[in-house]
UniProtKB/Swiss-Prot annotation:
Classification lineage: Eukaryota, Metazoa, Chordata, Craniata, Vertebrata
InterPro entries assigned to the protein according to its UniProt record, in alphabetical order: Myb_DNA-bind_4 (IPR044822)
Gene: MSANTD5
Protein name per UniProt: Uncharacterized protein MSANTD5
Amino acid sequence: MEIVILPTETTINIQKMEQENTAQGSEKPSVQSVKPWSDQEIRSFLQEWEFLEREVYRVKKKYHIVSKAIAQRLKQRGINKSWKECLQMLISLQDLYFTIQEANQRPRCQPLPCPYGEALHRILGYRWKISVFSGPPCADVVNLAPPEHPPQAYGVPIVFQEPMWAPTPVIYVENPQVPGWEPWNMNGHVPYMYPALPPAAPGPLTQWAISTD
């Protein structure tokens, strides 16, 4: 008599776990098969990146678009890299360049060297300048020196105009003998309005004769 063992729920779950572990084990070699970038591959990557930035994408494009284009051009050179690997390399090199540039802005004895600095500066130098000048406007206002040249040097016209009409100044006198203030009586004396006299024009002083008698 043969014994038939029916699969229970527990055995089914164990079989599923074994299948998942087997699948994960088969995926590990593919992850470990990713080769690191060699120096020559990085230099080829930078050449293609610089070409695309200057000749094709003269305006800033999204990283994944540039990465896909670089991956296609590297494939023509015999370098098989996925666009995701190119994207990771692009972001890593950009972060490296900006981090070293920011560190070199601080006072130090010698500037920090940047790997592949010349190529990265040709590609990312203008972006670094934009990021520096687009900072907060009040960050370094205290350290700014006054302008060396007047506004006229920058072609800004400065016009000094006198008012078209100015009222004649008057002197208001009302009962100068009375020290206190009293309300004005309609039946009383009307105050006078004396125009202010302009100052005398400067001229030669009068020579007075001194009598010797």
